[in-house]
Each structure stands twice: as structure tokens, then as C-alpha cells.
């Protein structure tokens, strides 16, 4: 039996610019960045003091869920709130009716034919929630003691504490709110999570196990514990109080000095083409290629891709083969573009290996300078921007980079472009790589 064709019918990014594709797209075209000094907590003890975040009035979760689900918001961590907001935006953008949109109306997609695959990260608990438990877990010398933690410390955590911070809670809440009863999964592979989730949804629809899926990822590392982990991993730029926060991230720049955290992500509606046609939907693009690989990570910590970009290049080549497209048919690239020197080097090497002399001319779409590194949600943002670019036949502006060696990645204004195929690829902190090929709807 022939595989079903899969299209993107709804976009739901959530970034420092707000909820939905329009605020993000407008900012990308205009060349604006949401990166600014952190206000959610005091960042003075950290070398990096900036991030891209949603303000409190941009995301009021109780206003974004049906009344019947508002009680559940008490056990939603920030990551879950982002995913719920993104899923709601994607559903509305796709013109779907779900239980959350109208509980009295018949759903557009039968619940048992609606899947959900969401990428998530290692969710850090709020420091305030842990303080009492940690305080009572001290030994006589004042140091943390695991025996005290088990005997008395955990008694100071709320009974549902664990259910707030499990990574699969993002998909759990989204599926409950929208009554998605089809195939569901959570993927936790750092920055590759969104792309891997989208690829899994694609395969689920191709083999006929679902007619549509909510897919992508979301994460927030804008809290002291998660921020500290990223600092120890050497991934964050050191910032100065007198510099422009929006100019810190410079992907593929010879002077790139690290990345900046962004909270957010993107969830899209993937749908079988026959389902989309039956309801007269207007897809953004067709998803025609997907591949994943694992880099060998030769260094002791295992945090970065190998310098020659071999694993990344393999993912790109396999995705192109699945799409039936040659490297010469790709019109634009949307890489991770993190501004982390080792990752930039690996991505650059992979691009040059696959595309040869074309690498210097292929335009890039970079999102991290605009919205920060959304980690598990990074690929979801990139796919949403790439799909919108294909629909509008417009390349968004690029920020900050100068002197990219052999790549078309320097800062540039937005412009019209003939985009038939766009390649989106991401490598992760653990060396997982994912590549997706989008094709224009003709």
C-alpha cells in the first residue's frame, strides 16, 4: 500500500514574541530579537544574564484552556504551559475543531485518529518548591544527605510534585485538553526532540495509524537550576552589562562565543493530505523527508557533534534520499545555528560535505538570534518558520553574523525567494541529529 502524503496545516510557535505564528513571523521578517536581560530571577551570579522569555501577560495559562481543564493548570510546570499554548495555537491555525475549541461540536478529526508527539527536556523544578525539602535534608554538618532526603525531605514536597515535572506531562495535558486518543509519545533528546517528534508523527500518519497529529516540542530553561546546567556545559555566552543583548548570538560567526537560552518551542499540525483536502484546508508545505542519526561525540563529556559533522551529514543525506530530492534541489537551509562554536563547526562541515560549492550560496534561515535556543522546542520553531517562509515565498532577515566562512549566513534583510524545497536540521547536546525536508505545495 502506498504511503500517505503528509502536510503541515497548522503552526503554533510560542516564543519571546508571543503565541502564534504571526508575531514570530513579523519579528523574523523585520529582523527583531526577543533577547533581553533576565527579570524572572536575579541573574547576577551567572556569566550570562540574558535570555528570550515570554512575559507574564503573554502567557496566562488559565485563559488558554477550557474551563473544565483549569484545575489541571495547578500542576502544570512552565514547559507544560508552553506546550499547551503552542498546541492551542496550532489547532486554531489549522482550523480544527477539538474538544478544547468547542466541546459541543463534532471534532474535525475523530479523537482516535488524532495523535500527539511532543519533544520535552529535563525539566528543572522551581527552586522555591525544593527549598523546604532540601533544608530538612541536611546532615549534622549542614550538607545535603540522601538519607535525610528519603526520611524527611521528600515529606515537604507536594503529593503531586512528580506529576508536575515528568517530561511526558507536556503530551499528557495536550492530549487530555484536545482529546487526542491516537498514537502518542514523548521524545527527550535535547534540541533534536522537536524534529524527532515531527518525524515520528510523519511516520504514524504515513502508515495509516492516524489522520493528524500535534507534533513538535517546548521547553523553558529560564530558571536558576536549568541555567546552571547550561553554564556548566559551556554552552552559554558570557555577557556584559554594557552590551546589546540582541547582538550576543552570532551563528557561524568566527567570533561566536556561545548561545543564549530562549523559552518556547513550536507545535504544528501534521495531517494526511487526503484528510486536509477533504476539509479544504490550505497546507503550508508537505513534509517529504525525515532522518535521524547519532554522532559519535568523541570528547570525554559527549556533549557535541564530531568536528567533521559526519553524523549531521548522514541525517541530511538520508532525509534527501527519502524525499527524492538531490542536494541541488534544496533552496534554503534552516540549521540549528546555535552560536556555540563546536556545534557551528560541525554543522558547517556537514553543509559543505553535502552541498559542496553550493554551500556558499544556499541561504540560511536562523532563529536562535531572534528567540534564543529553545532547546527541546528549537526544532519546532525552525519548522514553523520554514513552513511560513515556503507559504509566503519569503526568506526572513538574519541577524548579527559577519564573516561566516563559506556559508550564506551573514546578517541580511528579508527578501523574496523561490522556495520549493527547504531543509531543516538540528543537532543536540547529546549528539542526536535530525533532518526534515519540506516541499512547497504546487
Where are these regions (language model features)?
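ACP-dependent fatty acid/polyketide chain-elongation machinery
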Residues: 1-72, 94, 274-286, 384-399, ...
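Condensing-enzyme catalytic core mediating Claisen C-C bond formation in acyl metabolism
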Residues: 5-9, 36, 241-323, 331-332, ...
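Conserved beta-ketoacyl condensing-enzyme motif
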Residues: 8, 29-178, 182-185, 218-227, ...
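Acyl-CoA/ACP chain-elongation machinery
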Residues: 39, 211-257, 290-307, 335-345, ...
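Active-site nucleophile and cofactor-binding loops and adjacent substrate-binding regions
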Residues: 42, 75-81, 109-111, 161-167, ...
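Short, well-ordered amphipathic alpha-helical segments that serve as non-catalytic structural scaffolds
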Residues: 83-95, 272, 306-324, 350-354, ...
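Active-site-proximal alpha-helical scaffold in enzymes
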Residues: 83-96, 167-171, 175-178, 184-219, ...
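Glycine-/small-residue-rich "gating" segment that lines the acyl/pantetheine channel
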Residues: 138-157, 199, 203, 218-277, ...
